[in-house]
């Protein structure tokens, strides 16, 4: 069975997320642990956490298919010490929110070096992760590949490997692969040999067992455009046929697919249906 869902709103409470996930045809989800555009974050109350866990059990959502995503302001690669420290402090709180809710994974973008260079940025990210991980417990940080634009670190998977090499608690770091970001950075998943090359690179750098989530997004721009614009499934330059190639790999099927496509719950329900239609149309075998 395919594990699929979307980034879900928390405006009506954490406890609404499991049911809303089922309602859009999903069995997996990602959420922000707080207002993503704020440096402020607070732990959920005991009652909120209990309700959330009860709804998870009621709707039979596997904890391996539940993810949090860090806030937009976090930048562990920042050369500005105040921003770096605020990012570290916020990530610590986000980890604690995950722990209280029972969510095992916190996804982050590595960050932007803001012109100071990749090596310095990678060192700052690793220093920040060590500060976070050495002062928290349990939750696994997922490093996401990003688009090749600005001073972003992580547009090559090798960047993520260099970060992990500098992290003390390597067992608490894994990766997320974003299909739009990868396509935007030159990883062509529309061809069999492109997917084979990608999976081989992941295996050689990290081991495929470290791939915990796929952000399933089409791309509004062509291969290698470095624009970072997500598109609805099948409506972008990856397209139905391209996703059919990607979906056909068993290594891809074993990982939860989380939509971050434009729109809200209604559009995400349509995109989940579109994924099913692609699987059926191209007669893709699913375990």
From Swiss-Prot:
It catalyses: Endonucleolytic cleavage to 5'-phosphooligonucleotide end-products. Zn(2+) 3 binds at residues 181, 228, 230. InterPro entries: AP_endonuc_2 (IPR001719), AP_endonuc_F2_Zn_BS (IPR018246), Xyl_isomerase-like_sf (IPR036237), Xyl_isomerase-like_TIM-brl (IPR013022). Its cofactor is Zn(2+). It holds the Pfam family AP_endonuc_2. Endonuclease IV plays a role in DNA repair. It cleaves phosphodiester bonds at apurinic or apyrimidinic (AP) sites, generating a 3'-hydroxyl group and a 5'-terminal sugar phosphate. GO terms for molecular function: deoxyribonuclease IV (phage-T4-induced) activity; DNA binding; DNA-(apurinic or apyrimidinic site) endonuclease activity; phosphoric diester hydrolase activity; zinc ion binding. Its EC number is 3.1.21.2. Zn(2+) 2 binds at residues 144, 178, 215, 260. This is Probable endonuclease 4. PROSITE patterns: AP_NUCLEASE_F2_2 (PS00730), AP_NUCLEASE_F2_3 (PS00731), AP_NUCLEASE_F2_4 (PS51432). Keywords: DNA damage, DNA repair, Endonuclease, Hydrolase, Metal-binding, Nuclease, Zinc. Binds 3 Zn(2+) ions. Belongs to the AP endonuclease 2 family. GO terms for biological process: base-excision repair. It comes from the Bacteria. Coiled coil: none annotated. It comes from Thermotoga neapolitana (strain ATCC 49049 / DSM 4359 / NBRC 107923 / NS-E). Zn(2+) 1 binds at residues 69, 109, 144.
